[in-house]
Amino acid sequence: MGKIKKKGTSGQAKNYITRTQAVRKLQISLPDFRRLCIFKGIYPREPRNKKKASKTSTPNTTFYYTKDIQYLLHEPLLRKFREQKAVAKKIARSLGRGEVGDAARLEKNHAPKLTLDHVIKERYPTFIDALRDLDDALSLLFLFANLPSTAHVPPKTIALCQRLCHEFQHYLITTNSLRKSFLSIKGIYYQATIQGQDILWLVPYRFVQRVNGDVDYRIMATFVDFYTTLLGFVNFRLYSSIGLRYPPKFDTRSDENGAELAAFTLEGRGVGDAPKAIEAGNTQATTSTNNKEVSKEIQAKVDNVIKSAGLDEAKEEPAAETTEESSETIDKFEPAAPEADTLPQPDLSGNEAGSLFAPFTFYISREAPRAPLEFILRAFGCKRIGWDAVLGDGAFTHDETDTRITHQIVDRPQLPESSLPAIPAASKDGSDAVQKVKPGTRIPGRTYVQPQWVWDCINEGRLVRPDLYAPGATLPPHLSPWVKPSRGGYDPKASLAEQEEEGEAELDEDSDEEMEEATSDKKAEAKADVGSESEDEDESVDGGMDVAGTDDDESESEDEEEDFDGFEEEAASESEDEEEAARTQHQKELEAEAAGLPFSSNGATSDGSKKKASQAKKIAAKKRKEEEELERQKMMMSRKKRKLLEKMIYSNKKQSEEAAKLRSKRRKLEKGAAK
């Protein structure tokens, strides 16, 4: 007979451990335990049965894997936490004795500093692993870079986050790795491709942030400590991969004047070259630039060698041209059949992204968001960006009347000239040397666009029409570049004629007309009811007492209460009505012919209604036929496949209904705009 197993020695009770037991086992405080778990990437787990996992009668709420806690026993950070606890006791003892100087000395010189380098190496064995986990790090660091300094968020933390974020942005600008961006309610989404990994992060808008007290900034500060170390490692590796020195030179005075990205100076090879991606595997660009620098003498010798060898130049040149074209352009994948799935197309390469805004000179007005526009324009090849001196240093020009400016980004409404302020007078000391332009004026030879034009251009991968984004114009919808239209769904970019079903527009018009007629009938009935009520009030006598009805009223009520005689009388009455309508229509046609006038009023409407009715019948018959065919096909299926098909049909029907609602809404908006 086997031994009876003791409770809590196997199963879930052995695999899981409560948080209280873990804190006792590690001999640290609960805040230090939280920090240690965040640094090491250990999170609470949910057992299948909490009663079995718990060794006590009450089911606990927080559980961890026992192996994870066993793994934490050998962590070097535990020693640092214990040293911090010992120093904190000494500082408290000194403050209790009134020795403030000793307490300050202990805090400054003897407080142990945590280093997370070994934690980063343990959690991310390869650089690709670090890139995959960079989304949350960038989102949190960009958030703290835009927060105001408070007691919970010190200025040093904000400055560190700003410096790391600007360094990462400089790498994206140098290598043209930024691919897409989207303006949302939460903030601005960015997507970059680094070594084949897509990185997506969120940057908040630069509004005045109100720090609430319900946010636990201690937990967030722990994540910031970890992510700053991670981003420092990543930036060093990225800068080293393209031959740049890290960290780059930082001008404090320029940063205080609002230069931001311009406060950094990159040093190393490849900084002054053309705006192309500088990567180890990108050897085609370097070979092409080296070939252009070959002297004429060497080229002549090569030509002589080719002629002496008897090679056909005519055959070699087109081959070279085709190889160059294939290396510069991106292949487009087309579906084999029109009903096949849409194939995902490749994104822009670094060279194409670096030349999108390269030939232009931009000027950012004061009301436009300078920081995101500068980052996007520089990441897509623009080298000359100017703005007003109020926005900070680092601009290509502060003169709005510069003739080299080709595009100006404006985000203000169109106002009449009478309401515009006058040009401010220049100062006497001559410090205001730059000429001021009257607000709202247009300088010839320049394209004025709204900020959305920049985002739509980079998402489309080409320059879109700037007249659609003129100042004061109604902007086209700003769509997410990551949401692709599915088959049968609503596509806001396509026209209604391309995506609506057969007869959908006519049916929608008929339903709208019926709704309008119903509302007009309701209004007429309401007016008639009001009139009848007023007549009843006038006819009421004897203080509202009931008056006996006459014999005529009784006979009318008896006639109304006659028995139902069946559908034959209704059919006969309908046929009589149709004959009467045809007779009256023929009579009107004869009268119009005798008067010499064209008969088109009632005839056209009746013909149109007949056509619509016949078309609706055809569509209904077609749908009925398709449903019958589908039912016959379902009869040949097994029960499992039939259930799966019904689920698919249900989901597709829901999607088509939502798409039809959106198309109907768009149809009404277009009609209203046309009127």
Curated annotation (Swiss-Prot):
Residues 352-471 form the BRCT domain. One of its GO terms (biological process) is maturation of LSU-rRNA from tricistronic rRNA transcript (SSU-rRNA, 5.8S rRNA, LSU-rRNA). Gene3D superfamilies: BRCT domain. Residues 498-518, 532-541, 549-580 have a biased composition (Acidic residues). The keyword Ribonucleoprotein does not apply. Disulfide bonds: none annotated. Residues 551-675 form a coiled coil. Residues 519-530, 581-591, 624-634 have a biased composition (Basic and acidic residues). Pfam families: Pescadillo_N. InterPro entries: BRCT_dom, BRCT_dom_sf, PES. Keywords: Coiled coil, Nucleus, Ribosome biogenesis, rRNA processing. Residues 309-331, 475-675 are annotated as: Disordered. Residues 611-623 have a biased composition (Basic residues). GO terms for cellular component: nucleoplasm; PeBoW complex; preribosome, large subunit precursor. GO terms for molecular function: ribonucleoprotein complex binding; RNA binding. It is found in: Nucleus, Nucleolus; Nucleus, Nucleoplasm. Component of the NOP7 complex, which is required for maturation of the 25S and 5.8S ribosomal RNAs and formation of the 60S ribosome. Component of the NOP7 complex, composed of erb1, nop7 and ytm1. The complex is held together by erb1, which interacts with nop7 via its N-terminal domain and with ytm1 via a high-affinity interaction between the seven-bladed beta-propeller domains of the 2 proteins. The NOP7 complex associates with the 66S pre-ribosome. This is Pescadillo homolog. It comes from Aspergillus fumigatus (strain ATCC MYA-4609 / CBS 101355 / FGSC A1100 / Af293).
